[in-house]
A protein has these predicted regions:
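Amphipathic alpha-helical segments at domain termini/boundaries
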Residues: 1-23, 164, 169-205, 213-224, ...
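Conserved CoA-thioester-binding segment of acyl-CoA-metabolizing enzymes
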Residues: 1-58, 62, 270
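Short loop-to-helix capping motifs
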Residues: 24-25, 49, 207, 244, ...
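An acidic, glycine-rich surface segment that forms the CoA-thioester-binding/catalytic face
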Residues: 36-38, 44-48, 71-112, 145-155, ...
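Short, active-site-adjacent cap segments at secondary-structure transitions
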Residues: 62-66, 112, 134, 219
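Crotonase-fold acyl-CoA enzyme core
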Residues: 97-209, 258
């Protein structure tokens, strides 16, 4: 995967890690149709490339991570998003694209509106001290129904309502976002946050790809099921892994004091 320096999405492969950078810094890294298509293609490539174990997404520049939709560039009327179902119209975040691999979001600056999708839909979120959050939908007469619903999983109803109902009248600090659990880790600067994400990615890359994929599915499912339902679903995922070579390779490598040789094929059987 590659992209020109002028592309709205920069893609770099660093060993087993794909680094995606929203590249419209002069426009707040806002989302355009071209960028949305590039994101969808990138997520699908990441999920289907066995050499990629983990992905990082961040924004270019020093001020913004992502300020949401570039409204003037998005067709909302007849023949556009208005006539599309949710799954067809929303295919740009890792969760929307059903990415089975771990995704780390590095929030390097202000995030508003649609940019919150990446925060809500990533597996691990690393913020920096200037990474404030806003949701200005209602201030411009729009409904906050998607990003805010995703934030409920991370921070609860109160935090999501505070952002959604106050609109541009409330700006959540990065420290507050960390305290609420929206950010999993908080670093002083954007550079520090990206370095931390790369360190996490290196650790993640050493693990069994299939075990991580099933663990991720089980944990995300717990946000959608009742407690008994989540346990039953998790049990079935756990049992399905027993037939995979990594189930045997992990303990064997540990006993032999060597680095495991993981099998990236989810359909492999021992």
């Amino acid at each position: 995967m590659s992209a020109s320096p002028d592309s709205p999405l920069l893609v770099a492969i660093e060993q087993n890690t794909a680094v995606l950078t929203l590249n419209r810094p002069d426009k707040g890294n806002s989302l355009t149709p071209q960028l949305l298509l590039a994101l969808e293609a990138a997520w699908h490539h990441i999920d289907n490339d066995s050499n990629i174990r983990v992905a990082i997404i961040t924004g270019a520049g020093e001020r913004h991570f992502c300020t949401g939709a570039a409204v003037g560039d998005l067709e909302m009327g007849k023949g556009g998003l208005q006539n599309q179902p949710y799954a067809a119209a929303n295919r740009f975040s890792p969760r929307m694209c059903h990415v089975g691999k771990p995704v780390i979001c590095v929030v390097n600056g202000l995030t508003n509106g649609g940019g919150l999708h990446f925060v809500a839909d990533s597996d691990i979120v690393v913020g920096c001290e200037r990474a404030d959050l806003m949701d200005t939908h209602v201030s411009v007469g729009q409904v906050s129904a998607l990003e805010s619903a995703g934030l409920v999983r991370r921070a609860g109803v109160g935090a999501a309502l505070l952002l959604a109902l106050c609109g541009r009248g409330y700006r959540m600090s990065a420290k507050r976002a960390f305290d609420l659990g929206i950010f999993d880790l908080l670093e002083p600067t954007a550079a520090d946050a990206l370095t931390r994400a790369r360190d996490l990615a290196a650790a993640i890359s050493a693990n069994s790809p299939q075990a991580m994929a099933l663990s991720k599915r089980a944990i995300w499912a717990a946000t959608e099921f009742t407690d008994p339902g989540a346990a039953v679903h998790g049990w079935e995922l756990l049992k399905s892994h027993w037939a995979h070579p990594d189930f045997e390779e992990g303990p064997k490598a540990f006993a032999e004091k060597r680095t495991p040789k993981w099998n990236p094929d989810p359909n492999a059987r021992r």
